[in-house]
A protein has these predicted regions:
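A short, aliphatic-rich beta-strand micro-motif
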Residues: 113-121
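Allosteric cytosolic regulatory segments
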Residues: 149-156
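Acidic/proline- and glycine-rich, intrinsically disordered low-complexity segments
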Residues: 51, 65-89
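Signal-transducing coupling segments at domain and membrane junctions
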Residues: 65, 92-114, 134
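Helix-loop-beta substructure at the N-terminus of cytosolic sensory domains
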Residues: 20-57, 66, 76, 162
């Protein structure tokens, strides 16, 4: 299957997840799995803004005890930089040596070489960040950057739908 077809299939799967009656945590967890498979990356993480901090909400890593416990200010780390600057960040090698890098003892981030991150924007506000990481150096393509940006936009829409669902009266049927 052509890469463009695979990308379209990924977007369709994310869109279908958005329409299912699932908890937000479950949808985000499924999205990190889909992105990890598509990009053949070693790690995919989704952080959401909560009380002015970025909180880890979904992780493709085996150690899920870090979900909800890893928190960083918008001024911290590569992830905080992406949120603060509202810009994509792609580092092809030695991401751990970037001066913006922040080490977390509970995350194996210092073992990753390549890093790709995009802000999640909803209603013109940064509401989170999605990161992918590779253990080996990797120059991300423009298509990969665009794909992750689009998934970030879909997550932004998902968060709007999730808020509406919480506020809406229950319907029959």
């Amino acid at each position: 299957m052509e890469r463009a077809e695979q990308q379209l299939r990924l977007f369709q799967r994310v869109s279908r997840l958005m329409t299912r009656d699932l908890e937000l945590d479950d949808v985000l967890q499924e999205i990190v799995s889909l992105v990890k498979d598509f990009l053949t990356c070693d790690s995919c993480l989704i952080y959401l803004v909560e009380d002015g901090e970025l909180v880890l909400f979904a992780s493709s890593d085996q150690n899920r005890k870090t979900i909800g416990t890893v928190r960083l200010r918008l001024s911290e780390g590569l992830t905080g930089w992406v949120a603060r600057e509202r810009r994509l960040l792609a580092i092809s090698r030695e991401a751990y040596s970037d001066p913006r890098f922040k080490y977390f003892k509970d995350l194996p981030q210092d073992t990753f070489e390549a890093f790709l991150s995009v802000p999640i924007i909803s209603q013109n506000k940064v509401v989170g960040v999605i990161n992918v990481q590779h253990r080996e150096p990797r120059l991300h393509t423009g298509a990969e950057m665009e794909m992750l940006s689009t998934v970030g936009e879909q997550i932004g829409c998902l968060l709007v739908l999730s808020r509406q669902k919480q506020q809406a009266p229950t319907s029959v049927g």
